């Protein structure tokens, strides 16, 4: 039985503009891929034929933020990529929604103690649906899209624009969704660690074997001043050992 056959007068269907527009929007989502780490592989797998994302009306991934209405953030959000993510979000037309896919996009995941990792995408842009997992399977992302469709179905936004605070100032920097202290750390490029994470001393650097001074280590990036101290310490150690060897030969 078709939809029109359920009514006595098949030529007329009474509904509200909200329901009509929401029905069209939820069944014609244009996702914008914002893959940052390993969760992006599962996001790409969701668009493959064996998952058939098109049956939910969201199978066409937009190539431009100006043609998209759903941003899927999958992966670790660093302070460097936070600026790019916010600019892409600002370029998306209203109405727009955001899906945070994976533990890293939700709360930082296993990398939340990194110096440049934000505790989730919702620190800089508003998130509508969270899809947990490390990484979540394609079925989980599909369920997240279905959850977003249910949310869109209940929205009322015809005739007005949903209020969204400005996320970027005149210079293109993140403002609204970050505390002043955290924004200052990001803008100055300083190390950022969430509350409760003990900050490692900047003077002590654990160097991996086989890597030159100044490269990535087990604890992260080496600050320039610590890098110089590390080089100076190694040079002093080498000269000291040479003096000791000369002393032994003289004895």
UniProtKB/Swiss-Prot annotation:
Q: Which cofactor does it need?
A: [4Fe-4S] cluster
The EC number of this protein is 7.1.1.-
**How is it placed in the membrane, per its record?**
Peripheral membrane protein
Q: Which GO terms describe its cellular component?
A: plasma membrane; respiratory chain complex I
Q: Which reaction does it catalyse?
A: a quinone + NADH + 5 H(+)(in) = a quinol + NAD(+) + 4 H(+)(out)
Q: Which domain of life is it from?
A: Bacteria
**Record text on subunit structure and interactions:** NDH-1 is composed of 14 different subunits. Subunits NuoB, C, D, E, F, and G constitute the peripheral sector of the complex.
Name by which UniProt lists this protein? NADH-quinone oxidoreductase subunit B
Q: What is the lineage of its organism?
A: Bacteria, Bacillati, Actinomycetota, Rubrobacteria, Rubrobacterales
